[in-house]
Regions:
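Conserved thiamine diphosphate
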Residues: 2-131, 140, 156
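Generic long, charged, amphipathic alpha-helical segments
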Residues: 124, 136-137, 142-177
Length: 177
């Protein structure tokens, strides 16, 4: 992919999250340090119960953020359809990644559609002093947790990220309010 990018092409590397770990050296040296235009389309991102304990897609956000790569992790098809063309366009330069889970779309998350923003404030509880931040299909569990906590008089707000790295100053300031 780095070789194709060095010749002006825009390669898309479609790969399971767990197998992406094995290419970390090439990501650092051949793609990231040279700021090559490569899109990593990361399948099986997040928890993948049916694939066994060695195939959990949980490490790529940590190691891709270490090298400063922008990472997007939509929570539904509408967000994926919106953000993928942007990542494939000339609007973005350098390496970038988009993650998506195994399987279909959650009906609960589908209802949120796509705002076109890098993050959304999904749930506001009066008097909340706790903020839960999540992304991808884990947002559904976090929303449920916020409602359970609310029932115990522990109000929480919930933010859903699409762009999970890097955080913008705007996001940090909003969460701190």
């Amino acid at each position: 992919a780095a070789g194709l990018a060095s010749q002006g092409m825009l390669p898309v590397v479609c790969i399971y999250s767990t197998f992406l770990q094995r290419s970390y050296d090439q990501i650092i040296h051949d793609v990231n340090l040279l700021k090559e235009n490569v899109v990593f389309a990361i399948d099986r991102a997040g928890f993948v119960p049916a694939d066994g304990e060695t195939h959990q897609g949980i490490y790529d956000p940590a190691f891709l953020s270490q090298v400063g790569m922008p990472i997007y992790s939509p929570s539904n098809y509408a967000e994926l359809k919106y953000w993928l063309p942007i990542l494939l366009s000339n609007e973005m330069q350098g390496p970038r990644a988009i993650r998506y889970p195994r399987g279909g779309e959650s009906k609960a998350l589908a209802q949120y559609g796509c705002s076109g923003k890098e993050y959304d404030h999904l749930y506001t509880a009066p008097g909340a002093k706790i903020v839960l931040v999540s992304y991808a299909d884990e947002v559904e569990d976090v929303l449920n947790a916020a409602k359970l906590l609310g029932a115990e008089n522990i109000p929480c707000d919930v933010y859903k990220l699409v762009k999970i790295f890097p955080f913008t100053e705007e996001l940090i300031r909003e969460i701190m309010r």
